[in-house]
């Protein structure tokens, strides 16, 4: 069978289901593929296939994730669903599956539960920008007042973590009903169609990497006689054009220079674009004035910082992480983009130690500044071995 060509004519949006165990995330995921396959002709995926999600490795961390795709009238959605709570924690912290928006599934019969809260908090910490709510199992609730109560609780919870609780769309329905092709009182297929329409209208189209301001992490520095200094790396976002002014940020005081050439596979180009590996020739910059671990960026778009609040997942012993807990004052290396920088960890009030397999919020102080912004991912290493993964939740200074 010939492979289908991937059609790129619709905007691509990444979403995922979050919420407490057994509230119906996987059932809703399967129902979404069923309803969209009937309405918009995308492929249907069965519950069992999603539920037995394959193991993946992201940065040495084992995560079980199911990936499904479905189409609406105007968009193509890539959707992630994780079987276990630990998988969500790892997934969100490592950014293995970055979400442009999340579907919070909450059982109308049970209301918000501990993981409902934790997933909302994680979404805030790792920078999931939008949440849409699906109040599931509504066919099991006869009392309209109870539904209203649960809806209020969910809105309060969202507001607690700085999401717009009052304005968040909440769809009431039954994923199981929709999965079985039923639709009593519009709670089945109608509710799921409404959910898809809400995703279309409430989650804005993400800005593509190429439309963001230029940034390239420096991997290597060369000196070419008669030409000057060339730095190489993969352009993370944006475009760099010849004769544009750029900044060198991180590790040392920020300096300005001009890009006098872009090279790729020994060919000279006028520009380097997001996703490309290229060499950038820097005017008047000496070989020893720039190093791996710094970034080239559009002037004024990114600043160097040393202190930040982070959400961290500590690898378990089975994942090749530490065998013992660590305590406050722990000083590992933090690997940002292309380099390690030593830093010290301050644990939250009342947390004495962190065990392998835990996730924890911490404040990190680095010994050298790194070009960073909220949402930047990093690894925690000890002598080159990865022992944790984290994300910058909030820059302190």
Curated annotation (Swiss-Prot):
Residue segments, region G1: 19-26
Binding-site list for Mg(2+): 26
GO molecular function per UniProt: GTP binding; GTPase activity; guanosine tetraphosphate binding; translation elongation factor activity
Pfam family, one: GTP_EFTU_D3
Region feature G4, mapped onto this chain: 136-139
Top-level division of the source organism's lineage: Bacteria
Cystines in this chain: none
Chain residue ranges for the region called G3: 81-84
Compartment list: Cytoplasm
Chain segments carrying region G5: 174-176
EC identifiers of the protein: 3.6.5.3
Amino-acid positions noted as binding GTP in the UniProt annotation, renumbered to this chain: 19-26, 81-85, 136-139
Region (G2): 60-64
Residue stretches making up the tr-type G domain: 10-207
Broad class of the protein's primary localization: cytoplasm
Classification via InterPro entries: EF-Tu_GTP-bd, EF-Tu_GTPase, EFTu-like_2, EFTU_2, G_TR_CS, P-loop_NTPase, Small_GTP-bd, T_Tr_GTP-bd_dom
Reaction(s) this enzyme catalyzes, per UniProt: GTP + H2O = GDP + phosphate + H(+)
Annotated keywords: Cytoplasm, Elongation factor, GTP-binding, Hydrolase, Magnesium, Metal-binding, Nucleotide-binding, Protein biosynthesis
Cellular component terms per the entry's GO annotation: cytosol
UniProt enzyme class: hydrolase
Quaternary structure and interacting proteins, as annotated: Monomer.
Record's function text: GTP hydrolase that promotes the GTP-dependent binding of aminoacyl-tRNA to the A-site of ribosomes during protein biosynthesis.
Family under the similarity heading: Belongs to the TRAFAC class translation factor GTPase superfamily. Classic translation factor GTPase family. EF-Tu/EF-1A subfamily.
Full protein name: Elongation factor Tu 1
Gene name as annotated: tuf1
């Amino acid at each position: 069978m010939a492979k289908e060509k991937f059609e790129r004519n619709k905007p691509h949006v990444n979403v995922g289901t979050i919420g407490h165990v057994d509230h119906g995330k996987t059932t809703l995921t399967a129902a979404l593929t069923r309803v969209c396959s009937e309405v918009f002709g995308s492929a249907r995926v069965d519950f069992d296939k999603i539920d037995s999600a394959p193991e993946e490795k992201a940065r040495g961390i084992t995560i079980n994730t199911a990936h499904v795709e479905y189409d609406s009238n105007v968009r193509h959605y890539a959707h992630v669903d994780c079987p276990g709570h630990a998988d969500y924690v790892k997934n969100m912290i490592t950014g293995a599956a970055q979400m442009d928006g999340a579907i919070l599934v909450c059982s109308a019969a049970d209301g918000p539960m501990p993981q409902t809260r934790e997933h909302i908090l994680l979404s805030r910490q790792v920078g999931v920008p939008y949440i849409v709510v699906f109040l599931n199992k509504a066919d099991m609730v006869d009392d309209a007042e109870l539904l209203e109560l649960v809806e209020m609780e969910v809105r309060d919870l969202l507001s607690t973590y700085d999401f717009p609780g009052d304005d968040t769309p909440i769809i009431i329905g039954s994923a199981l009903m929709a999965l079985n092709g039923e639709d009593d009182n519009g709670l089945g297929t109608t509710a799921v169609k409404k959910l898809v329409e809400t995703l279309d209208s409430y989650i804005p189209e993400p800005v593509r990497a190429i439309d963001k301001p230029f940034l390239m992490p420096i991997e290597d520095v060369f000196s070419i006689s008669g030409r000057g200094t060339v730095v190489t790396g993969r352009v993370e976002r944006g475009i760099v054009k010849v004769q544009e002014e750029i900044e060198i940020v991180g590790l040392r005081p920020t300096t300005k220079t001009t890009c006098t050439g872009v090279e790729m596979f020994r060919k000279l180009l006028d520009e380097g674009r997001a996703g490309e590996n290229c060499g950038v020739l820097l005017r008047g910059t000496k070989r020893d004035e720039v190093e791996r671990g710094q970034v080239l960026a559009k002037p004024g778009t990114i600043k160097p910082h040393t202190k930040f609040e982070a959400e961290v997942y500590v690898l378990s012993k089975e994942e090749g992480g530490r065998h013992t807990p660590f305590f406050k004052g722990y000083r590992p290396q933090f690997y940002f983009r292309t380099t390690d920088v030593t830093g010290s960890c301050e644990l939250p009030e009342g947390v004495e130690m962190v065990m392998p397999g835990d996730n924890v919020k911490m404040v990190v102080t680095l010994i050298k500044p790194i070009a960073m912004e909220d949402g930047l991912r990093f690894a925690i290493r000890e002598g080159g071995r990865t022992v944790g993964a984290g994300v910058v939740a909030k820059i302190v200074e």
